[in-house]
């Protein structure tokens, strides 16, 4: 119904924000990390939205990036995963880390999200592992400076996994191999060379 809403932040709560656009105040439920990135009241923001309707419930969920929205909608296709669990996952893992966790069948990372137990993590992996493309593994990682080690590490991991997939290796095999030999500060080229030797 709404692709995004652009307006001013009027109120921030623990689980939602109110954005005024065209004289209408929209209550948008979102991850705490997104709320914290929205700036102070009066700030102009653009928030991507998903209009969730079930029986007598109609709720707007919002996201700071298209990648988070895509991740949310992908999670909703999993049996037993509702909006709250999906938001919990987004609050815990970035899209790139989530995709890597799924294709490498890393249940430990998935269960870090509040409300996601082992059975749910296994179901998420089973339902989504074949739906995640190599483009999704890399497209959600923002360009950043080397000082940001966490994001740079994500980028190296994802690019290395993508390179192995281009060479014909399966996503789960590539992710598992790369995760097992990754070292802080290693380049994509070095990581791929090491991976090819171990495969």
UniProtKB/Swiss-Prot annotation:
The alphabetized UniProt keywords are: Cytoplasm, DNA damage, DNA recombination, DNA repair, DNA-binding
* Compartment annotation: Cytoplasm
Q: Which Pfam families match?
A: HHH_5, RuvA_C, RuvA_N
Which biological processes are named by the entry's GO terms? Answer: DNA recombination; DNA repair
Region named Flexible linker? 144-151
This entry's Gene Ontology molecular function terms read: ATP binding; four-way junction DNA binding; four-way junction helicase activity
Which portions of the sequence form the region Domain I? Answer: 1-64
- Which GO cellular component terms, listed alphabetically, does the Swiss-Prot or TrEMBL entry include? cytoplasm; Holliday junction helicase complex; Holliday junction resolvase complex
As for what it does, the entry says: The RuvA-RuvB-RuvC complex processes Holliday junction (HJ) DNA during genetic recombination and DNA repair, while the RuvA-RuvB complex plays an important role in the rescue of blocked DNA replication forks via replication fork reversal (RFR). RuvA specifically binds to HJ cruciform DNA, conferring on it an open structure. The RuvB hexamer acts as an ATP-dependent pump, pulling dsDNA into and through the RuvAB complex. HJ branch migration allows RuvC to scan DNA until it finds its consensus sequence, where it cleaves and resolves the cruciform DNA.
Subunit relationships: Homotetramer. Forms an RuvA(8)-RuvB(12)-Holliday junction (HJ) complex. HJ DNA is sandwiched between 2 RuvA tetramers; dsDNA enters through RuvA and exits via RuvB. An RuvB hexamer assembles on each DNA strand where it exits the tetramer. Each RuvB hexamer is contacted by two RuvA subunits (via domain III) on 2 adjacent RuvB subunits; this complex drives branch migration. In the full resolvosome a probable DNA-RuvA(4)-RuvB(12)-RuvC(2) complex forms which resolves the HJ.
State the domain notes: Has three domains with a flexible linker between the domains II and III and assumes an 'L' shape. Domain III is highly mobile and contacts RuvB.
For this entry, the protein name equals: Holliday junction branch migration complex subunit RuvA
Species: Ruminiclostridium cellulolyticum (strain ATCC 35319 / DSM 5812 / JCM 6584 / H10)
């Amino acid at each position: 119904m709404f692709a995004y809403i652009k307006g001013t932040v009027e109120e921030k709560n623990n689980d939602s924000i109110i954005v005024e656009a065209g004289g209408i105040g929209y209550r948008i439920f979102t991850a705490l990390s997104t709320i914290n990135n929205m700036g102070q009241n009066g700030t102009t923001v653009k928030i991507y939205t998903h209009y969730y309707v079930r029986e007598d419930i109609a709720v707007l969920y919002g996201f700071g990036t298209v990648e988070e929205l895509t991740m949310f909608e992908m999670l909703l296709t999993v049996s037993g995963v509702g909006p709250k669990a999906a938001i919990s996952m987004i609050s815990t893992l970035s899209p790139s880390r989530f995709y890597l966790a799924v294709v490498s069948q890393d249940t430990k990372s998935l269960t870090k999200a509040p409300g996601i137990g082992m059975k749910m993590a296994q179901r998420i992996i089973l339902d989504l592992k074949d739906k995640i493309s190599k483009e999704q593994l890399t497209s959600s990682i923002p360009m950043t400076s080397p000082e940001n080690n966490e994001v740079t590490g994500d980028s190296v991991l994802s690019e290395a996994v993508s390179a192995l997939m281009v060479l014909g290796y399966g996503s789960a095999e590539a992710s598992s191999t790369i995760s097992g030999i990754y070292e802080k500060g290693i380049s994509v080229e070095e990581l791929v060379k090491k991976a090819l030797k171990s495969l």
